[in-house]
Amino acid sequence: MNVSERLAASAVVPVVVLDDAKDAVATAKALLAGGVDVMEITFRTAAAADSIKAVAESCPDMLVGAGTVITLEQCKKAVDCGAKFIVSPGFDEEVVRWCVENGIAVTPGCVTPTEIMAAMKLGLNVVKIGRAHV
């Protein structure tokens, strides 16, 4: 099953904000123990890249991705650290194009028909619309 298929098959994708990378592996293991094998670690803190790397290296059964990716630099860093998918709060053509060209699953945030059409033009069939607060 490829990354997009695993994401589609997942009942839930937890969005995880970590202030300290030392908590990353324990969080991933707890999710795996609960039957969740996908997680999105956000770039809202300085610990994001190290957290992604720790999970990618220590938890091979966890599909780890990066969220709140807003720059190409963050995107490349996330992928270098082991992120298998990228989620962005907005549509950044540079980020999306780089992901598409490098075979990285990407879900940009889109709120207008123009953004959705731009995503489709780049070959995407999934976009993020809005946010859910639970």
Report each predicted region and the residues it spans.
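Conserved N-terminal beta1-alpha1 strand-loop-helix module at the mouth
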Residues: 1-84, 91, 101
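Conserved small/polar residues in nucleotide/adenosyl-binding loops
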Residues: 132-134
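Expand to "…catalyze enediolate/carbanion chemistry for C-C bond making/breaking, isomerization
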Residues: 122
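Hydrophobic, well-structured mid-protein blocks that either form specific transmembrane helices
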Residues: 76-115, 119
